[in-house]
Amino acid sequence: MNWQPLTIALVPTAIAWSITVWQVRTQRVRQIEDVYVARYWSLLDKFSAATLRGLDGHMLEPQEELAIRLYFRLSEDEADLRSQGWVSDDTWRDWSGAISSQMHRQPFARLWVQTLEDAEDGRDYEFKHLRRLLHDRAYDPPPSGILRGWLRRAPWRRSTGS
């Protein structure tokens, strides 16, 4: 039996299939990132000008305090998605820097201390990723599986950012 015609047909098919899977996955990652960006902006809309400027000492409205606490959860979710491979390298670089900066600004920093106390008492999330990110701006959540870890370190995944 001559395998050449079959090989000629299967190799391009396998390559085309691989490219299609990669493109679909990349599109799905972008869709997930877009959803989280929209959630971020909807929370930002609930902040007063004083909060956006990082001023402390003003009385937070209940809606504003809730939005800040939801921001913490959103940020933890983003880090979780990163560990599952659903956030790209470039996007995580942007998000992690912004999250770290925001967590050090008032009134976020003050509410973060309260949130940690609640977490220690079992009344809130554990926030394992945010705790690390707060102290290490370059923190990148470890991949949740062996294959994801290998893929994240793969040589063809070159950074397009700085």
Give the positions of each predicted feature.
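Membrane-proximal alpha-helical anchors
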Residues: 1-65
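An amphipathic alpha-helical interaction surface
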Residues: 63-68, 72-162
